[in-house]
Amino acid sequence: FCRRDVSHQSVGAQILGLARHNKNMFTRFVENISEEKDWCTYWEINRYNKPAPADYTNDKEFWYNLNANFDVMQACLKKYQWTGDAGYLTDPLFTNFYEKSVNEYVHRWALEPEKIMDRSPYMNQPEDFNPNNNFHTCRGLPSYVENFRGLTVGVDLLATMYAGFNAYAEMAGLTGDDVKMTKGRTQAEAYREILENRWWNPDSSFYQTFWTEDQKFYRGEGVPFILWFDASENPDRIRASVKDILSREWNVENM
């Protein structure tokens, strides 16, 4: 069970009557967050709630896409909206995951709005860091794109963080915590401002998708996440992004 896939397919699962299965999977994901994994959880688990060997050796060597925590947060809000299950808002396993994700996790991986464009492609690595070991180089991928070397931020990460912080704000509002609600909305808007002010290319009428360690933009996958997470409010840019998506064939994981 993959965090990205569960997050993106859980509404369909709900429609099929699988609310109990959704709750079980999200519970397993949120309960496995830990400082030893630098506030990541497991990228994929099996039916025994164990990390999939294809993605995990130990807490210092594993595969993880940084979008995941925020994707789970927005998905959990949707599950509450579909089910009315207050556990998504108040269960200590879930609230601990939300708080660690918007605080310690963001700090540990230099994802704050003021730092995200200057972060390193490889962070929180073991002393014996091996650039040829995928469980070193992919432990904290800043995108769902997994094959672009030197990537420090993907546009999909920005969009997912926008959605995650918005979800955090809405859940805080539902539980009467106005301070956290304001914090979430403010930080979500900060990511949107970065997207609109720095990632939009007015000459070509598209969003850039990759930001790299050499401080340059490149183009590739990621634009659908801007629309999926409502990260842009600009009608002209939204229409241009739809045109951009339709202009070529994409990897299914980009859709």
Set out the residue ranges of the language-model regions.
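The feature captures the catalytic groove of carbohydrate-active enzymes
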Residues: W43-D71, A86, V106-T186, E221-F225
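Proline-centered turn/helix-capping motifs that create local helix->coil transitions or kinks
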Residues: K37-D38, W109-P121, W199-S204, A231-I238
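Substrate-binding groove/exosite segments of carbohydrate-active enzymes
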Residues: F1-L77, Q81-L89, V223-L227, M255
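Internal, well-ordered domain-core segments that constitute the primary functional module
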Residues: L77-H107
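Short amphipathic alpha-helical coiled-coil/interface segments
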Residues: M181-W199
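Short, flexible helix-adjacent loops and helix caps
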Residues: S34, Q81-Y88, A110, G173-D177, ...
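Active-site core of glycosidic bond-cleaving carbohydrate-active enzymes
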Residues: C2-S34, P92, N96, N103, ...
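Structured segments of extracytoplasmic/periplasmic soluble domains
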Residues: R28, N32, A75, W82, ...
